[in-house]
């Protein structure tokens, strides 16, 4: 339920099984260390220092990284953009690849245009 919504699992059993098997094959010690790092390192005070464009893509039903957490990051980083994918859980790139790609493409196009206008003429 954390990685995919029940509806996605029912509609895409093969994809879900493949992803879950890949996660299960991960080294237990390394995965536990990663989870510990994520749980114990509070970087909220550092967010305001981020000065590069930031796009956050959240799944509406993501219990691992709730939208409230994403909203906190977006509010703390100047100019950050938060996009929420409806009916998606944590694995938004798997559950909604086209939507994710379109969001990334639009973000990169916007950032590229802004950067070009900020560059000095040679």
Predicted ranges, named:
Residues 34, 73, 100-103:
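Hydrophobic alpha-helical packing elements
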Residues 27, 66-69, 96:
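Active-site helix-initiating loop/hinge in glycosyltransferases
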Residues 36, 43, 52, 66-75:
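Short alpha-helix in the alpha/beta-hydrolase fold that links the catalytic acid
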Residues 1-49:
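Conserved alpha/beta-hydrolase catalytic His-Asp/Glu region
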Residues 46, 53-55, 78-81:
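Structural signature of beta-strand start/N-cap positions in the alpha/beta core
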